[in-house]
Amino acid sequence: MSLNSSLGHRKELSNLTEGASDQGGSGVTEFVAIVIITVFVCLGNLVIVITLYRKSYLLTLSNKFVFSLTLSNFLLSVLVLPFVVTSSIRREWIFGVVWCNFSALLYLLISSASMLTLGIIAVDRYYAVLYPMAYPMKITGNRAVMVLAYIWLHSLIGCLPPLFGWSSVEFDEFKWMCVAAWHREPGYTAFWQIWCALLPFLVMLVCYGFIFRVARVKARKVHCGAVVTVEVGVQRTGRKNSSTSTSSSGSRKSAFQGVVYSANQCKALVTILVVIGAFMVTWGPYMVVITSEALWGKNCVSPTLETWATWLSFTSAICHPLIYGLWNKTVRKELLGMCFGDRYYREPFVQRQRTSRLFSISNRITDLGLSPHLTALMAGEQPLGNSSSTGDTGFSCSQDSGTDVMLLEDYTSDDNPLHGTCPPKRRSSVTFEDEVEQIKEAAKNPILHVKADVHKSLDSYATSLAKAIEAEAKINLFGEEALPGVLLTARTVPGIGFGSRRGSRTLAGQRLQLQSIEEGDVLATEQR
């Protein structure tokens, strides 16, 4: 009996030793993981906040939502995660009951505000793409501020009930932080999930679904050969002649546009999948865990799964600055410029100021619906004519964060016709990465810009005006015989002589015609 008992004690001691070693190994792994998460959340969101704060021309209406998102994530890394790191070391909460309640409130408040902000960003992209003409009236500065205030108020309403008796706050030994006791009040668990998580997720699905539908519609139009090109030419008389032609699917231009639209469709799909996929991967496991706790009790989920699901929700704060900030080439270039100086500042300051209002951090989605003239009018600036690369369908490729820009005039005219609109004309879309690359691309692929048309029209007008002045001076000084025969024939109207009143009216009419060319046609050419 003594031998058997000693062997049993040895087995128990060995099991306890193995359990302690396993617990110590898992504790070190958890500590390293939460430290890495905290550092990445803090640094990633901090660089975006600093970039937007110091480069205020990037802080457009759309980017105000992104600024609020990254700022809230940074507050999470400063006010919540350090205490989680400490609790993972001590395996207990040592900061008192008051701070336990406050940290739980902060975690729920910041997490709820982040998810709701993602939904608002999706709504902003929806209006920018599907209703570009109404976008400046729908999304204004005052409304953006009101929406941000509502987001935080909405989140606060969803987070306060545990402090007033509906559920409670407790320290979870497997999450290593103070959270709401999801297993005590299933009703509050369902309320918080619907109020703060499910609602923005459904909004994202609907808005990005419509956006991708628009991309598919535009791609189908190109592949089916329904691309209409409007070419405008100037005749010798100064009048414009418009001819409309439909490009065939077998032509090089249509084939190229089909490839570009197909690439745009793929990139739009990738962007949407990344945004929605990041939300589902980071928050999905946590929602499953708290739902299981509310339905089947606290011990229905393994401690390891509970810990990693909670900490996986923290990684959503890492994904946000990557998706909405560092993924964009312009933001990366601004960040590198601040870190390493002018080596990465290839754009002059004036040019950055011109293009700043046309830029959005999340423009992989936004720029799908904004034409250059509309965006420039929103910014209160002139459209950029020398930095556009347009196709005959109004489509252009943006170098900003790999965005492909698609105008939606065709989609609007098909599904949502606007009353009193003008006939469709050739539209252009302004894109930019930096002026150096645009100039190089323009040198490789010559494009007939608006300025070239203006200069050509001005030269033609100046030549015609000089000839008319010379001819009229010769008539006044030397008479009609001084004019060449060809010019005399051109000036003579059948049945009307130069000496009659009708002939003088003809000269006056030509002067008015020249004045009309100067004041009307040139202005129209500049506007075109």
UniProtKB/Swiss-Prot annotation:
Gene Ontology annotations for the cellular component aspect, listed alphabetically: ciliary membrane; cilium; recycling endosome
Side of membrane Cytoplasmic, spans: 52-64, 123-143, 212-269, 328-528
Extracellular side, ranges: 1-30, 86-101, 165-190, 291-306
Glycosylation sites (chain numbering): 4, 15, 101
A molecular function GO annotation: G protein-coupled receptor activity
GO BP term, example: G protein-coupled receptor signaling pathway
Subcellular location: Cell projection, Cilium membrane; Cell membrane
Principal subcellular localization: membrane
Source domain of life: Eukaryota
Disulfide bridge partners, by residue number: 100-178
PROSITE patterns, A to Z: G_PROTEIN_RECEP_F1_1, G_PROTEIN_RECEP_F1_2
TM regions (residue ranges): 31-51, 65-85, 102-122, 144-164, 191-211, 270-290, 307-327
Membrane topology (UniProt): Multi-pass membrane protein
Alphabetized Pfam families for the sequence: 7tm_1 (PF00001)
SUPFAM superfamilies reported in the protein's UniProt record: Family A G protein-coupled receptor-like
Keyword Methyltransferase: no
Keywords noted in UniProt: Cell membrane, Cell projection, Cilium, Developmental protein, Disulfide bond, G-protein coupled receptor, Glycoprotein, Membrane, Receptor, Transducer, Transmembrane, Transmembrane helix
Family stated for the protein in its record: Belongs to the G-protein coupled receptor 1 family.
Function: Key negative regulator of Shh signaling, which promotes the processing of GLI3 into GLI3R during neural tube development. Recruited by TULP3 and the IFT-A complex to primary cilia and acts as a regulator of the PKA-dependent basal repression machinery in Shh signaling by increasing cAMP levels, leading to promote the PKA-dependent processing of GLI3 into GLI3R and repress the Shh signaling. In presence of SHH, it is removed from primary cilia and is internalized into recycling endosomes, preventing its activity and allowing activation of the Shh signaling. Its ligand is unknown.
Protein name according to UniProt: G protein-coupled receptor 161
Source organism: Bos taurus
